[in-house]
Amino acid sequence: MPTSTSATVRIALFGHVSATPAALTKALGDQGISIEATGDDLAHVDCAIFAVNPSAGIDAETITAWESFNDYLTPRIMVVLALPGAELDFDDAVSLANRVFDQMATPYLVLHSDDGSPAALISLDDLTIRNYLHGVAVISESEPEHKELVADFAEEYRELVESSGEDAFSAGLLFPAIPVNLENGIGIDVLVSYLRKLK
């Protein structure tokens, strides 16, 4: 049963309409996570989520919103939505965000099925695989070829986390990029786990 985050945690969501922020808000609401309208009250936002459609890029308004939180050291997460028919993917969005937002941390990478659709996530922390069945993550050990495929990315991620320090996300110093597919639930649990770290 989903539990609610504390009433004192204020979470805001930003993103171009092409990134379907309304659908993401609903998916989070289904998990007991409330998204609040912020207006100009940025100082009291505890976390900002930035929804990105890889095919549409990141618009100037979203970049400005990201930058507006720099002075507050507000925790920020980029959610990259897998949308039907999208030509670009998670890796493309992260590359762009590294240029226009900040250095992004990628705790998970997407594993694709034979038809090219997102099928699972692999953790760069412990190299486990999260397969999603009806929106529920089933965690298993990765195969040796998966470990080899992501070895360099995992090392880079661990170095970034180590250099950022403990609780760097909550301190607004480490910016996770999370792949999400609303159709099959990929990544929603990962996003929720980050949001629940906030106090």
Label each PLM-derived region with a short phrase:
Residues P2-L28, V45-C47, P54-K199:
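P-loop NTPase catalytic nucleotide-binding module
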Residues G29-A43:
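A short, well-structured beta->alpha microelement
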